[in-house]
A protein has these predicted regions:
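N-terminal pre-domain segments of enzymes
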Residues: 1-46
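Generic detector of low-complexity/intrinsically disordered segments
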Residues: 5, 43-45, 62-63, 74, ...
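Intrinsically disordered, low-complexity boundary segments flanking structured domains
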Residues: 34-40, 72-77, 86, 132-140
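Short Lys/Arg-enriched alpha/beta "domain-start" segment
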Residues: 37, 53-73
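Structured segments of extracytoplasmic/periplasmic soluble domains
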Residues: 67-75, 126, 180
Length: 284
């Protein structure tokens, strides 16, 4: 492939990012031609009100509460007499929760913030389907602990464009986009970094723009945490020594030749020797 013939990557923020920032309002499609059954809790005509009593000093649930209240407003159910009691109960596994729909109230309980978040999303989906909720107990827990995805337009810092998402001003994680990911069950996102971009006592020339990278990384971590999403840094390290774009230049090891291990690919590359003391110290 002739990479020189490829067009340049578009500059600036893609236009579709503005679409990602927009909220998609709830539109009712309820079947109101029937009355509620005796074993159902009807949310009509009075509506429901959220009563959060779960301890959350870091305010990680603020986004989930705001999202739920906005949904109630769009569904014309806010400020009603039926309470949704959100409380802490010990003994649940991580992210597990119990949603109890009673005759006159709804109780959501969990042992951690993410269980409450998942429970609110589940309750929202139940109400979106019908304002008549069948009374009973819903005990739920995730069957997959780490549900990791990736920003669909986030660069991976590889040829031909080599764009580093931590070095530009593009917002890859708008609030509404994160809200949608969280609703779909995503609790992790990954992004790419390289050791050569981080400060190193073994390679003093590295990490020139580390402060800028780490500042945006911290901002991303903090924003995603508000939606129950962790950030995973992908590091395919240590690199080989050689002349390819994916390798560490051989001259970088001129002061530490012990870092160059076995020769491979007819001598074109040298492995990074982690068995030496210098090698073990080279990891950030």
């Amino acid at each position: 492939m002739n990479l020189s013939a490829m067009p340049d990557f578009p500059k600036g923020t893609p236009a579709f990012v503005e679409m990602l920032k927009k909220h998609e309002p709830f539109i009712q499609h309820w079947d109101l031609s029937r009355p509620s059954a005796p074993d159902e809790l009807s949310l009509l005509p009075g509506g429901i009100s959220l009563e959060p009593a779960f301890p959350d000093p870091e305010k990680l649930l603020d986004t989930a509460y705001a999202d739920f209240r906005r949904f109630l407003s769009e569904a014309e159910l806010s400020g009603g007499k039926i309470p949704v009691k959100v409380k802490e109960t010990a003994g649940f596994p991580e992210e597990a929760y119990r949603l109890t729909i009673e005759k006159e109230c709804i109780v959501l309980e969990s042992s951690d913030t993410e269980g409450i978040r998942r429970g609110l999303y589940y309750l929202r989906d139940l109400i979106a389907a019908s304002p008549f909720l069948k009374q009973g107990v819903h005990d739920r827990k995730p069957w997959l602990k780490n549900r990791i995805s990736r920003c669909f337009f986030g660069p991976i810092k590889r040829p031909p464009f080599n764009i580093d998402e931590l070095m530009n001003d593009i917002d890859y994680y708008p609030e509404e986009y994160l809200s949608r990911l969280a609703h779909e069950g995503i609790n992790g996102l990954w992004l790419t970094m390289y050791f050569r971009d981080l400060p190193s006592s073994i390679f003093p020339g590295r990490g020139k723009d580390a402060e800028k990278r780490l500042a945006k990384l911290r901002l991303t971590v903090e924003r995603c945490a508000r939606y129950g999403i962790r950030i995973y840094v992908f590091l395919s390290e240590p690199k080989l020594f050689g002349s390819s774009h994916f390798a560490v230049p051989m001259e970088d090891a001129k002061d530490h030749p012990e870092l160059v291990g076995a020769s491979i690919a007819d001598g074109r590359f040298g492995t990074f020797c982690t068995s030496t003391e210098t090698g073990s110290l080279s990891f950030p």
